[in-house]
UniProtKB/Swiss-Prot annotation:
Coiled coil: none annotated. Keywords: Disulfide bond, Hydroxylation, Ion channel impairing toxin, Knottin, Neurotoxin, Secreted, Toxin, Voltage-gated sodium channel impairing toxin. Transmembrane segments: none annotated. It comes from the Eukaryota. Confined to the epidermis and to the mucus layer. Negative results: does not show effect on rat Nav1.8/SCN10A. Toxin with similar potency against both insect and mammalian sodium channels (Nav). Delays the inactivation of most Nav channels tested (B.germanica (BgNav1); EC(50)=87.2 nM, human Nav1.1/SCN1A; EC(50)=125.8 nM, rat Nav1.2/SCN2A; EC(50)=97.9 nM, rat Nav1.3/SCN3A; EC(50)=127.7 nM, rat Nav1.4/SCN4A; EC(50)=1150.3 nM, human Nav1.5/SCN5A; EC(50)=149.2 nM, mouse Nav1.6/SCN8A; EC(50)=1361.8 nM, human Nav1.9/SCN9A; EC(50)=1296.7 nM). Inactivation is completely prevented by a concentration of 1 uM, resulting in sustained, non-inactivating current. One of its GO terms (cellular component) is extracellular region. It is found in: Secreted. Its main location: secreted. This is Nemertide alpha-2. Disulfide bonds join C2-C16, C9-C20, C15-C26. One of its GO terms (molecular function) is toxin activity.
């Protein structure tokens, strides 16, 4: 399944918007 937007937020990786299998995209952390 896919992780919902805003899930798994960390200071280092930011917020992941998609996580399906090996494909994932993370936005930069908010200042």
């Amino acid at each position: 399944g896919c992780i919902a937007t805003g899930s798994v937020c960390t200071l280092s990786k930011g917020c992941c918007t998609k996580n399906c299998g090996w494909n994932f995209k993370c936005n930069p952390p908010n200042q």
